[in-house]
């Protein structure tokens, strides 16, 4: 499934809850957390309390060295029962293909991101296409919790994303 929303809508809080519930329901279940960049994977580990988050490249064995271990690892299905990938909007078609081809039957996948932020550098807008295809369950978080109720930052960001140039001004 997909969880999407603007900054401050609670994506990280939802992830923490998913992990907590999953651990209670499936105490022996294998969980893998990944993100496209080292910074995003570290932030994911810190915010969820799950210290095994890693980059997609590392998790898929797509290291810079072309050694036998990486080649073998690239062909094996991921052993996880639950795979959560944060910042999926940054994933291009090549990396998405590598990722999806490694999912074992029965694994649960949660893709998280904001399609209006950090698009992939490579070809393809995979996250947006998955959201729009109507084949994958999508949860859109649209209430902003990070800013105060009087803040106009979130409103203006939404207006800009919609192409609206009439912005509101206030104390922040």
Describe the role of every protein-language-model region.
Residues 11:
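Conserved lysine of the Walker
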Residues 87, 113:
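Walker B catalytic acidic pair
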Residues 21-30:
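Post-Walker A helix-loop "phosphate-sensing" segment adjacent to the P-loop in P-loop NTPases
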Residues 31-81:
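Inter-Walker segment of RecA-like/P-loop motor cores
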């Amino acid at each position: 499934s997909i969880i999407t929303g603007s900054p401050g809508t609670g994506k990280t809080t939802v992830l923490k809850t998913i992990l907590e519930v999953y651990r209670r329901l499936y105490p022996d279940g294998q969980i893998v957390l990944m993100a496209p960049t080292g910074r995003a994977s570290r932030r994911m580990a810190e915010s969820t309390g799950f210290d095994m988050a890693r980059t997609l490249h590392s998790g898929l064995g797509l290291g810079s060295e072309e050694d036998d271990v990486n080649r073998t690892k690239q062909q094996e299905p991921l052993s996880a029962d639950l795979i959560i990938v944060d910042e999926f909007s940054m994933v291009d078609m090549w990396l998405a293909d590598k990722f999806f081809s490694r999912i074992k039957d029965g694994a649960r996948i949660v893709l998280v991101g904001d399609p209006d932020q950090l698009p992939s550098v490579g070809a393809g807008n995979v996250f947006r296409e998955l959201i729009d295809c109507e084949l994958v369950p999508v949860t859109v978080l649209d209430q902003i919790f990070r800013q105060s109720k009087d803040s106009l930052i979130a409103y203006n960001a939404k207006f800009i994303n919609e192409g609206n140039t009439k912005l509101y001004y206030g104390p922040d």
